[in-house]
Structure formats: C-alpha cells, structure tokens
C-alpha cells in the first residue's frame, strides 16, 4: 500500500483518487473532501477505512452525544418512522458530515455528493492502488499528548448498535482471510 502526502492544491483535476482515512480527524478530512468535490467537478473521491476516522473529545461525552441525537426523534412504536434518519455506521456518518458541508439544495452540491464514495475497510478492487493522505495525520500529534481525548467512529458505532457492529466484525474477519488468500500473504 503506497501512501502519499499531498495538499489540496496538488490533487488532480479529473479522475479518481482514493483517500485512506486511517487516523484522520473526521471533520478536518470532511472539509478537504467537500472543498475538493466543489472545486473540481470532474474529480471522484473514494474514502476507505472510514471506521478508523477519529472524533476528538472525551469518549463518554461523544458516545452520549450520538446516543442522545439518535434517541431524540424516536417514537416508541416505530423508532425509524418519524423524524430525521440519523446514520449509525461509520461510512454513512462520514458521508453525512460531508453532506452537511455541501450546498445540497442546488445541482452543484448534489452532483458533488454523488461523486463521493465511502467504504469501511478497503475493497478488494482498491487494495493495490495508490492511497493518499492529504496532510500530516493529526492523530499522531494527539497520541503524543498523554491526556489527549479522542474516539474512533468504530467505537462509537460499537456502543450505539452492538448487534450490527458484531455482525460487521465477523464479516470483516472472513474478508481478511479472503484477502490473504487472494494476495498470497
């Protein structure tokens, strides 16, 4: 896996780029992605490893905020029927963050959102392609500080919807075995 460090100005004008989200702060990466999608109308962006995105803040506080946001609109007889649909999976959470940064009510914003794909882990067809890291990973700076507080989107998902997370984790283990067979590792 080849990782390059690039700034936004050095991104190509057209084509497809793959961004490895491992260790990035979710909001900062989302601003880069939203800006690139709006400035370059023929550029497609694929974000992989969305479950490894980081949200800064106290772990308990972040998880409670997500739980409150989800349960605020629920009704007792059908939790998903009324109110806005709040995503729980890390890939959908990140896409929702980017959607909030785009002008989704006009054509430009809608087309930008259509050109964004977000995956948890790395799909097999993108395994050997170049992946970009847009800037110095801020998580490395956070780990140096002993009292730095952050939580990954996977941890948030595990605390919100354990059954779905557990099912994904089992599928992920099978997927890793399959990748090892294909790559011969």
Swiss-Prot record:
One of its GO terms (cellular component) is cytosolic large ribosomal subunit. PANTHER family: LARGE RIBOSOMAL SUBUNIT PROTEIN UL13, RIBOSOMAL PROTEIN L13. This protein is one of the early assembly proteins of the 50S ribosomal subunit, although it is not seen to bind rRNA by itself. It is important during the early stages of 50S assembly. One of its GO terms (biological process) is negative regulation of translation. Belongs to the universal ribosomal protein uL13 family. Pfam families: Ribosomal_L13. The lineage of its organism: Archaea, Thermoproteota, Thermoprotei, Thermoproteales, Thermoproteaceae. InterPro entries: Ribosomal_uL13, Ribosomal_uL13_bac-type, Ribosomal_uL13_CS, Ribosomal_uL13_euk/arc, Ribosomal_uL13_sf. The keyword DNA repair does not apply. It comes from Pyrobaculum islandicum (strain DSM 4184 / JCM 9189 / GEO3). Keywords: Ribonucleoprotein, Ribosomal protein. The keyword S-adenosyl-L-methionine does not apply. SUPFAM superfamilies: Ribosomal protein L13 (SSF52161). This is Large ribosomal subunit protein uL13. GO terms for molecular function: mRNA binding; structural constituent of ribosome. Part of the 50S ribosomal subunit.
């Amino acid at each position: 896996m080849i990782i390059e460090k690039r700034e936004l100005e050095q991104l190509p004008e057209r084509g497809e780029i793959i961004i490895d989200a491992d260790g990035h702060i979710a909001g900062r990466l989302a601003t880069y992605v939203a800006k690139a999608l709006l400035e370059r109308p023929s550029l497609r962006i694929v974000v992989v490893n969305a479950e490894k995105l980081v949200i800064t803040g106290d772990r308990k506080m972040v998880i409670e905020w997500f739980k409150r946001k989800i349960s605020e609109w629920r009704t007792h007889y059908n939790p998903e029927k009324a109110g806005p649909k709040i995503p729980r999976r890390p890939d959908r959470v990140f896409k929702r963050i980017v959607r909030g940064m785009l002008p989704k009510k006009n054509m430009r914003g809608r087309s930008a959102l259509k050109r964004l794909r977000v995956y948890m882990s790395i799909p097999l067809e993108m395994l050997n392609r170049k992946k970009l890291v847009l800037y110095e990973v801020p998580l490395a700076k956070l780990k140096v500080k002993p009292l730095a507080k952050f939580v990954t989107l996977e941890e948030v998902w595990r605390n919100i919807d354990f059954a779905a997370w557990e099912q994904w984790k089992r599928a992920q283990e099978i997927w890793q075995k399959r990748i090892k067979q294909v790559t011969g590792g």
